[in-house]
């Protein structure tokens, strides 16, 4: 049961953070999804979601942006 809860929490966080990222960086959700996939942001979210979801959303968004920027993203 704990694994199901953790998976549910992870899905909820990812579903929340991608539109927040889109709003913060003036993209629509689809553009944000492709941007995050292309520049490593989604892999970062997927791997570190547990830490990101406990952080202030502005810091989490900045961390995700920094990962993308280091991988060639220029938004």
Predicted features and spans:
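N-terminal acidic leader/helix
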Residues: 2-26
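Amphipathic, hydrophobic secondary-structure cores in small proteins
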Residues: 22-24, 28-55
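Short hydrophobic/aromatic-rich motifs at helix boundaries and adjacent loops
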Residues: 1-5, 33-36
């Amino acid at each position: 049961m704990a694994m199901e809860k953790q998976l549910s929490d992870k899905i909820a966080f990812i579903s929340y953070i991608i539109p927040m990222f889109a709003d913060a960086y003036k993209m629509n959700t689809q553009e944000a999804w492709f941007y995050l996939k292309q520049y490593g942001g989604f892999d970062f979210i997927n791997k570190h979601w547990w830490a990101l979801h406990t952080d202030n959303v502005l810091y989490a968004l900045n961390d995700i942006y920094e990962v993308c920027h280091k991988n060639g993203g220029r938004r």
